[in-house]
Amino acid sequence: MSDISKASLPKAIFLMGPTASGKTALAIELRKILPVELISVDSALIYKGMDIGTAKPNAEELLAAPHRLLNIRDPSQAYSAADFRRDALAEMADITAAGRIPLLVGGTMLYFKALLEGLSPLPSADPEVRARIEQQAAEQGWESLHRQLQEVDPVAAARIHPNDPQRLSRALEVFFISGKTLTELTQTSGDALPYQVHQFAIAPASRELLHQRIEQRFHQMLASGFEAEVRALFARGDLHTDLPSIRCVGYRQMWSYLEGEISYDEMVYRGVCATRQLAKRQITWLRGWEGVHWLDSEKPEQARDEVLQVVGAIAG
């Protein structure tokens, strides 16, 4: 697309970053100054009843800066990148039609990628094919299926660990249904985002600072009643660790504690470690991201001013 035609597109802002980097605080600050409406880009914040462990904006923050795509699913329900793209595009169109600018804030990089680049034409899940794969895994083990994937799609096999049955079975399922590999199909992108996007990433300047913030926040969550929140989910009886909601960082570790599998101290240790690993993956995504403007979360006023400098011209 030429620069002239891109300039004629409606404007949007991406505010990305690892967990505990100060994204929400900056987004709320920007909403006071710019004509923006906020859309959450977070695969955990979509769930109702999961507030403390996801660091969901509190009632006061949401009053000052409402977020769209919060609390839109029950924890028993799945929500895909395709679901997000559909919903986000609808919200963006609604915001643009009102003469305002969508500001998408969050840390689920897969959602940002799906929104920006479109989605590959992957086949829908087939319960029969999936059942055959799981039966084979039960008989031969996931290592055997991983070797099978290596033969048909070595690129995907190098990326997927043998102990990751969800992604492994999906890669094989795609091949069995379509006759094409996951790698081949994901190289075919869908429709690009029809917006002129200003992209920002916020993070502390050092990994040590981010690690400190993550540990502090995890302990703050515990002090705020995180255990009671997960106990309420646990008591429902219809939720389990195979669900995306309960696999969320922090929730999975607390669930293991409630099931008596690990001690409280081990839960805290694992929860902090898992959150740090999540942040590392998010930063790895962002380092390979094109056209992103980096902001230092230890200097919030400077970060705000840098965003205003870049996008201020679009606010008139």
UniProtKB/Swiss-Prot annotation:
GO biological process terms, semicolon-separated: tRNA modification
SUPFAM superfamilies, per the entry: P-loop containing nucleoside triphosphate hydrolases (SSF52540)
Keyword Nucleotide-binding attached: yes
First-level EC class: transferase
Spans annotated as Interaction with substrate tRNA: 42-45, 166-170, 247-252, 280-287
Function: Catalyzes the transfer of a dimethylallyl group onto the adenine at position 37 in tRNAs that read codons beginning with uridine, leading to the formation of N6-(dimethylallyl)adenosine (i(6)A).
Protein name as annotated: tRNA dimethylallyltransferase
